[in-house]
C-alpha cells in the first residue's frame, strides 16, 4: 500500500520588552521564546473489491399436467367403459420416446439458459461494482486533494499570523526604544538646564606669619556655565 509522507516545521518566536521607569533606566532587555511545531501528513488510497454474491434459488413452477391428464383420461375412460361394458382398464401413462426426447431437450435448454442468465447477471454486477469502485476512488482522491489544499491554506495562515505577530513586536520594540531615547534626551536637557541655573561660590583665605611679616591672601570665585569671575586680594605686612 504506497503512501506519501510530508513533514512540515513551524517556528514561532515571541519577544517581550520590559517597560521603562522614569526615575531609573536599565539597559533594554528582550526575552525571546521559540516554539517549534512539526506536522507529519501521510496519505494513501486503497479500495477492496468485494462483489456481493446473491445466491437466489431458481423459480419453482409446480406443473400438474401429468396428474391432470391422468385424471381426465382415467375418468373419461372409465365413463366410456361403464357405458359399454361396465368394466375398467388400467391406462399406461409412460411417456413416448418423442415426449421423452422433447423433455430432455427442454431440460438441457433450461439448464443452458439458466447458466447464461447467471453469467450475464454476474458480469453486470461486476461491471457495476467496477464502476462504483472507480467512482469511489475518484471521490476519495478529490476529497484528499481538497484536504491537502485546506492543510496548505491552514499552514499559510499560521505563517502569516506569525509574521504579523513578529512584525507587531518589532514595531513595539522600536517604539519603546524610541521613547526611551527621547526620555534620555529630556533628562540630559534637564540636567543641562539645572547646571545653567546653578551658581557655585568659593571663598579662599590664607594667612602666613613669617619672619618677614604677616601675609594675608584671599580670593572669591563665582562660577556658572556662562560666566566665571575670579577676584583676588593680596595683603602683605
Curated annotation (Swiss-Prot):
Residues 132-150 are annotated as: CAHS motif 1. The keyword Coiled coil applies. Residues 98-201 form a coiled coil. Residues 1-17, 91-105, 226-237 have a biased composition (Basic and acidic residues). Its main location: cytoplasm. CAHS proteins are cytosolic heat soluble proteins that seem to contribute to the anhydrobiosis in tardigrades, but their specific mechanisms are yet to be identified. It is possible that protection during anhydrobiosis might occur via the stabilization of vitrifying small molecules such as sugars, but not via the direct glass transition of CAHS proteins themselves. CAHS proteins contain 2 repeats of 19-mer peptides designated as CAHS-motifs that comprise each two octapeptides connected by a tripeptide. Trehalose, a disaccharide essential for several organisms to survive drying, is detected at low levels or not at all in some tardigrade species, indicating that tardigrades possess potentially novel mechanisms for surviving desiccation involving tardigrade-specific intrinsically disordered proteins (TDPs). This is Cytosolic-abundant heat soluble protein 1. The lineage of its organism: Eukaryota, Metazoa, Ecdysozoa, Tardigrada, Eutardigrada.
Amino acid at each position: 500500500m504506497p503512501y506519501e509522507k510530508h513533514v512540515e516545521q513551524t517556528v514561532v518566536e515571541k519577544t517581550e520588552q520590559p517597560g521603562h521607569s522614569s526615575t531609573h533606566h536599565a539597559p533594554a532587555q528582550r526575552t525571546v521564546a521559540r516554539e517549534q511545531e512539526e506536522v507529519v501528513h501521510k496519505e494513501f488510497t486503497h479500495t477492496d473489491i468485494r462483489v456481493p454474491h446473491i445466491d437466489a434459488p431458481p423459480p419453482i413452477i409446480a406443473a400438474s399436467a401429468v396428474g391432470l391428464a391422468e385424471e381426465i383420461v382415467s375418468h373419461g375412460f372409465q365413463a366410456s367403459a361403464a357405458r359399454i361394458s361396465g368394466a375398467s382398464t388400467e391406462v399406461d401413462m409412460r411417456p413416448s420416446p418423442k415426449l421423452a426426447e422433447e423433455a430432455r431437450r427442454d431440460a438441457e435448454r433450461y439448464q443452458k439458459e439458466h447458466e447464461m442468465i447467471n453469467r450475464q447477471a454476474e458480469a453486470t454486477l461486476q461491471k457495476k461494482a467496477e464502476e462504483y469502485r472507480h467512482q469511489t476512488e475518484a471521490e476519495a482522491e478529490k476529497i484528499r486533494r481538497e484536504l491537502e489544499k485546506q492543510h496548505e491554506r491552514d499552514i499559510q495562515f499560521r505563517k502569516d499570523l506569525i509574521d504579523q505577530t513578529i512584525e507587531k513586536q518589532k514595531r513595539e520594540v522600536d517604539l519603546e526604544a524610541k521613547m526611551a531615547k527621547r526620555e534620555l534626551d529630556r533628562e540630559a536637557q534637564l540636567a543641562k538646564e539645572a547646571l545653567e541655573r546653578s551658581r557655585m561660590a568659593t571663598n579662599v583665605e590664607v594667612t602666613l606669619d613669617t619672619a618677614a611679616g604677616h601675609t594675608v591672601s584671599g580670593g572669591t570665585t563665582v562660577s556658572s556655565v556662562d560666566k566665571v569671575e575670579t577676584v583676588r586680594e593680596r595683603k602683605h605686612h
